[in-house]
């Protein structure tokens, strides 16, 4: 059979292709491999997105010989997408794998011993701290770090060195989601879970190409649509992508106008009596940018967002806006909203999250099976490691804040440090951290398990900054950041180590170690402990003899009314994850937060109680529409948005090592509407040049295909790691004023035939 992208997708059992073909997805069987005879199978979790799919790994003679979906895991029930299906490939390759410590000498990275590399790292960090103070150093981590890794890094930098310059790449993907949760409910992470999919009647998907970014979730949605009664899907997106294939209503709004659209939905819901006055009275309050307002004032605010007024802003028809609002608010039907980077990666990302919650709070469609606003997460432990672990510059573990003295005292008591050595000042957020590396404020920077030399916006500026600081990178594969490093430390990869991940539905899961690390690679925890010891903080870290010891200490950060209650490490090793809070009242975990009888922190008789707020009430916000930081003009007449395809992940550090994926996915590309292409004389497959105010790249034009942007919009894949094709040379580093998350999804470019 001829090997085409279509056959590749089908052969890989991708849910989207199977649904399009009219058949139901089935669990992926392991590839036939005689080596599995006599192998040992280990329970673990997928290394890629935030869904948290269970994976079984077969190892024999210190080699991964097979992987398969874990049929006992309730998240994926045996299904794997193409990335998970080929996880064995990334474990067995040595192409691009970092096998020894490297030190830059005479401009070249050269092999070194662990002692030489670690001593150099400690010496340069100690020099910076002693001469320029604790805020002259920083740590940039990842939603791919294990929870234990984030915990140790946090303690080292915040508890011992005394700086809050601890950031992570969840700032680039989930910070606005966090800010939305905190401002609306007072607590981070969702009240619902993935089981809501099987109960929902209406799915409202906005800012998410779920079919390609979260394919296992999409497979569950399509199964629900196929098997449920009168299940509807509404898609709101500037680009027609795979989800549109199953959408009953498709709303291709003009880029950057979705806040106006969400306000229009709220206006219709109230105008047509689809709201729930009793729920609103008992469980909500109202605010605008200046403080408390009344329901009547909120209704008055919405009069600027009638469908007729919003139609010319969004480019949609009033009738389509009303039809979608009626479906979302329909009485007797359960609505689940799902969103991801299209909402979060915006300068109004926090407000957009608020506006989504408004719809569920106005209708009372929340905290019930199937009635669920559900924020999707992009990395396997952005929640469990960074958000819950406090791995950002304003956070401490389990929802605490660095500016709160009592919080610092609580954390210091567990860490065994004097709380006065902990800074009360918020550290640099991600973009400011890299600017500080460029202008001399940060003298030494440690990066773990992420590739900012490819992934951050306004990349010309970022890469220049990385060349000016003492840069240490801990990673498993060479990438566009390791090439800039002064020291590279080889990290253990996935099932070469054990630990904890936390997924998008509050599910904490254990990853087993199946094989030893390749070459001289070491687990990140080991590396961080060695750095701590060499910096002179060994007394605070010497008791960490295993990941279990670290986890059990982290558990002490929860409990005590924080709402972050976790099970002992041993339980996670045995079970397929538990959704927190987990305690004596709810030993099996919590299905729905804020619900009496399910969430152990809801007072008796309260029914639903949003205990993150002092009055137990969620906030409905009046959030006005605001244009993106950059819109097209005569010089840069196109909108640009960036994103991903199903087969690849992030900066392809791992997926490029899989020949089947590279061959099947084909060339990376830039999508352009056929009318725009014709006007510019561009044909499918031509090279095009894209230029923004920050840089330029070339790309291969895709005219028609799996997705189609609207006229005036071009969509560029984020994955390509070739210098002349790095999408983030173009993107805007403007940030949301609350969350400090960057606006990857909307900027202005010029498009020309190359």
Swiss-Prot record:
CDD domains hit by this protein: MopB_CT_Nitrate-R-NapA-like, MopB_Nitrate-R-NapA-like
Cellular location(s): Secreted
Cofactor(s) in the UniProt record: [4Fe-4S] cluster; Mo-bis(molybdopterin guanine dinucleotide)
Keyword annotations of the record: 4Fe-4S, Electron transport, Iron, Iron-sulfur, Metal-binding, Molybdenum, Nitrate assimilation, Oxidoreductase, Secreted, Signal, Transport
PROSITE patterns per record: 4FE4S_MOW_BIS_MGD, MOLYBDOPTERIN_PROK_1, TAT
Record PTM: Predicted to be exported by the Tat system. The position of the signal peptide cleavage has not been experimentally proven.
Pfam families xref list: Molybdop_Fe4S4, Molybdopterin, Molydop_binding
Reactions mediated catalytically: 2 Fe(II)-[cytochrome] + nitrate + 2 H(+) = 2 Fe(III)-[cytochrome] + nitrite + H2O
GO CC terms in record: extracellular region; membrane; nitrate reductase complex
Residues annotated to bind Mo-bis(molybdopterin guanine dinucleotide): 83, 144, 169, 173, 256-258, 341, 345, 451, 497, 524, 642-651, 728, 745
UniProt family annotation: Belongs to the prokaryotic molybdopterin-containing oxidoreductase family. NasA/NapA/NarB subfamily.
Subunit structure: Component of the nitrate reductase NapAB complex composed of NapA and NapB.
Protein name per its UniProtKB record: Nitrate reductase
Protein source organism: Symbiobacterium thermophilum (strain DSM 24528 / JCM 14929 / IAM 14863 / T)
Gene coding for it: napA
């Amino acid at each position: 059979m001829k090997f085409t992208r279509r056959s590749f997708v089908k052969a890989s059992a991708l849910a989207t292709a199977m649904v399009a073909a009219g058949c139901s997805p089935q669990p992926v069987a392991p590839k036939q491999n005689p080596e599995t005879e006599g192998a040992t199978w280990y329970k673990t979790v997928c290394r890629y997105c935030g869904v948290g799919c269970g994976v079984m790994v077969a190892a024999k003679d210190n080699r991964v010989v097979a992987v398969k979906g874990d049929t006992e895991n309730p998240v994926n029930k045996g299904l794997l997408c193409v990335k998970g299906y080929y996880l064995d490939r990334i474990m067995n390759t040595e192409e691009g794998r970092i096998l020894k410590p490297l030190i830059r000498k005479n401009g070249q990275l050269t092999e070194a011993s662990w002692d030489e590399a670690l001593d150099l790292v400690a010496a340069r960090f100690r020099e910076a701290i002693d001469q320029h103070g604790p805020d002259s150093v920083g740590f940039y981590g990842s939603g791919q770090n294990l929870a234990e890794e984030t915990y140790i890094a946090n303690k080292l930098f915040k508890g011992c060195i005394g700086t809050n310059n601890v950031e992570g790449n969840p700032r680039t993907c989930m910070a606005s989601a966090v800010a939305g949760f905190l401002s609306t409910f007072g607590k981070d992470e969702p009240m619902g879970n993935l089981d809501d999919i099987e109960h929902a009647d209406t799915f409202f998907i906005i800012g998410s190409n779920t079919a390609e970014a979260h394919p296992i979730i999409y497979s569950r949605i399509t199964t629900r649509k196929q098997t449920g009664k009168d299940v509807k899907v509404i898609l709101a997106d500037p680009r027609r992508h795979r989800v549109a294939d199953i959408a009953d209503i498709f709303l291709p709004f003009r880029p950057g106008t979705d806040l106006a659209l969400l306000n229009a939905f709220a206006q219709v819901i109230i105008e047509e009596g689809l709201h729930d006055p009793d729920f609103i009275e008992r469980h909500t309050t109202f605010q605008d940018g200046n403080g408390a307002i009344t329901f009547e004032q909120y209704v008055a605010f919405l009069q600027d967002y009638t469908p007729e007024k919003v139609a010319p802003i969004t480019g949609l028809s009033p009738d389509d806006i009303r039809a979608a609002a009626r479906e979302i608010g329909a009485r007797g039907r359960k609505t689940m909203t799902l969103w991801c980077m299209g909402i979060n990666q915006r300068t109004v990302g926090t407000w957009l999250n608020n506006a989504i919650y408004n719809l569920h709070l106005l209708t009372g469609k929340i905290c019930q099976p199937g009635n669920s606003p559900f924020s999707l997460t992009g990395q396997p432990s952005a929640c469990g490691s960074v958000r819950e672990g406090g791995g950002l510059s304003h956070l401490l573990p389990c929802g605490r804040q660095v500016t709160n003295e009592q919080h610092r005292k609580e954390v210091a008591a567990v860490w065994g440090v004097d709380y006065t050595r902990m800074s009360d000042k918020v550290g640099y957020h991600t973009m400011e951290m890299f600017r500080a590396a460029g202008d001399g404020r940060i003298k030494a920077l440690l990066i773990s398990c992420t590739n900012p030399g490819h992934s951050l916006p306004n990349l010309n500026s970022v890469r220049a900054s990385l060349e000016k600081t003492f840069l240490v990178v801990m990673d498993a594969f060479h990438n566009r950041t390791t090439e800039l490093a002064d020291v590279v430390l080889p990290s253990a990869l996935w099932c070469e180590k054990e630990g904890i991940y936390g997924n998008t539905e509050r599910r904490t899961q254990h990853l087993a170690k199946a094989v030893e690390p390749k070459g001289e690679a070491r687990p990140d925890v080991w590396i961080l402990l060695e750095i701590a010891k060499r910096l002179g903080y060994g007394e605070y870290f010497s008791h960490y003899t295993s990941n279990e010891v670290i986890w059990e200490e982290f558990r002490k950060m929860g409990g005590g009314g924080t709402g972050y209650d976790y099970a002992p490490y041993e339980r996670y090793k045995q079970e397929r994850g538990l959704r927190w809070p987990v305690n004596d009242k709810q030993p099996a975990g919590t299905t729905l937060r804020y619900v009496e009888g399910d969430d152990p922190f809801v007072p008796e008789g309260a029914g639903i109680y949003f205990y993150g707020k002092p009055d137990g009430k969620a906030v409905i916000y009046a959030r006005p529409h605001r244009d993106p930081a950059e819109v097209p003009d005569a010089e840069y007449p196109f909108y640009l948005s960036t994103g991903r395809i199903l087969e690849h992940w992030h900066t392809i550090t791992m997926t490029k090592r899989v020949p089947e994926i590279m061959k099947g996915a084909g060339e990376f590309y830039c999508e352009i509407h056929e009318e725009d292409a014709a006007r510019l004389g561009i044909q499918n497959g031509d090279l095009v040049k894209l230029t923004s105010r920050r840089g330029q790249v070339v790309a291969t034009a895709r005219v028609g295909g799996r997705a189609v942007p609207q006229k005036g919009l071009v969509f560029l894949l984020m994955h390509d790691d070739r210098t002349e094709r790095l999408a983030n040379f173009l993107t805007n580093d403007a940030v949301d004023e609350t969350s400090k998350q960057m606006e990857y999804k909307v900027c202005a470019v010029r498009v020309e035939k190359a």
